[in-house]
Amino acid sequence: MVERARRLGRWFLALDSLLVILGFFVVMPMISLRFVDQQGWAAGIVGLALGLRQLTQQGLGVLGGSLADKFGARPLIVGGMLLRAAGFASLAYAQSGLELILSCIISGLGGCLFDPPRAALVIKFTRPRQRGRYISLLMMLESAGAVVGALLGSWLLNFDFEYVCLLGAGLFVCAALCNLLILPPYKLSQRPTPIRAGLGQVLADKAFCRLVLILSGYYALWVQVMLIFPILVKQMAGTTTAVGWMYTLETAISLTLLYPLARYGEKHFKLENRLMAGVLLMTTGIGLVAFATTLPAVFVLLACFYLGIVIAEPARETLMTKLAQPGARGSYMGFSRLGLALGGMTGYVGGGALHDYANAQGQPWLPWLVLGTVGVTTLLLLVNCFHREPSLARVNI
């Protein structure tokens, strides 16, 4: 691929990511507020619905990636985004737990189609030395989109949840049209790869599979920004607007620190050390919420948590792209989402159930201590994994 095509591809992917993240954050953080806080549903039910969405999207991501290896990126991306739009639109009319679960699963099916090929396009449009920086820039752009989306969603939630869902659906329809009309029919692999062959190549890479599974603990922490963090902040502040403050804080940290930290980290630290440092900060931030009694204290710990994500996520994504084999990029990037599937499902369901149990028992600190323990366990497993598998660290050379 010529450099001009790579450069145009990077610009398109950046703008496309902004539309996708706007559509996602308009809707997703509002689901727990709508059904738990406003409607009085059990957090466990809402967590189950969100977890099944995560499990569907990321658990089937390896299938979406394999299909993209065979048929190319564009048809999977366009079809997946339209399916996501349908799922978000149906959320507006969910009146029971079953309807909420079905809407979330439809949304997840859309994601399992468009997410792996988009991740594989990052590999196609970047050279290895510039990939980490480009991923960091994408994360900065996505953070800005997240805060705008969350602020829009929290504002529209004051009027009607239907407006929230229809705006999110509309943004995904726009993204689908842009991909249909602008994105060339790129192939992701060096040659069309049979689905079974791509899957087999990934499953034979034991070190990669082990790392992906360990990272499910990282994601169990990460998804709490969609579930119990918004509930806690809203309850302590007394207004849904405070949820927007959460994402404003995240954006401020991302825009000011993400790129400089990523550049500094590239020069001075290995990818695995950056990843583990980020998990340590996330664990500290989420575990100490158990002892926070004021909203400012919660926001200080949120800042620590977000800083951990800012350090860990570029390193994690860069590590995944470097470990992906050229003959099965879509399959590798799809399988890399399995950790998010398992961790997201566990985090959503476990977080929601712990929230309900803690409220019933008068022990509001319990979910945060349990999540802190998950973080410590994940960190220890990562240390052991990188020690046992030097090949995972060798990609830094």
Swiss-Prot record:
What residues form the membrane-spanning segments? 11-31, 71-91, 94-114, 137-157, 163-183, 211-231, 242-262, 291-311, 338-358, 366-386
Q: Which CDD domains match?
A: MFS_MdtH_MDR_like
* Matches recorded under Gene3D superfamilies: MFS general substrate transporter like domains
The membrane-topology field of this record reads:
Multi-pass membrane protein
Query: Which keywords has UniProt assigned to this entry?
Result: Cell inner membrane, Cell membrane, Membrane, Transmembrane, Transmembrane helix, Transport
Concerning InterPro entries, the annotation shows: MFS, MFS_dom, MFS_trans_sf, MFS_Transporters, Multidrug-R_MdtH
Q: What is its main location?
A: membrane
Q: Which GO terms describe its cellular component?
A: plasma membrane
Q: Coiled-coil region(s) at which residues?
A: none
Q: Which GO terms describe its molecular function?
A: transmembrane transporter activity
The subcellular location is: Cell inner membrane
**Classification via PANTHER family:** MULTIDRUG RESISTANCE PROTEIN MDTH, RESISTANCE PROTEIN MDTM, PUTATIVE-RELATED-RELATED
UniProt lists the family membership as follows:
Belongs to the major facilitator superfamily. DHA1 family. MdtH (TC 2.A.1.2.21) subfamily.
The protein's matches in NCBIfam families, at most eight in alphabetical order, are given as: PRK11646.1
Spell out the protein name for this chain.
Multidrug resistance protein MdtH
Can you name the source organism? Answer: Aeromonas salmonicida (strain A449)
Mind giving the lineage of the organism this protein is from? Bacteria, Pseudomonadati, Pseudomonadota, Gammaproteobacteria, Aeromonadales
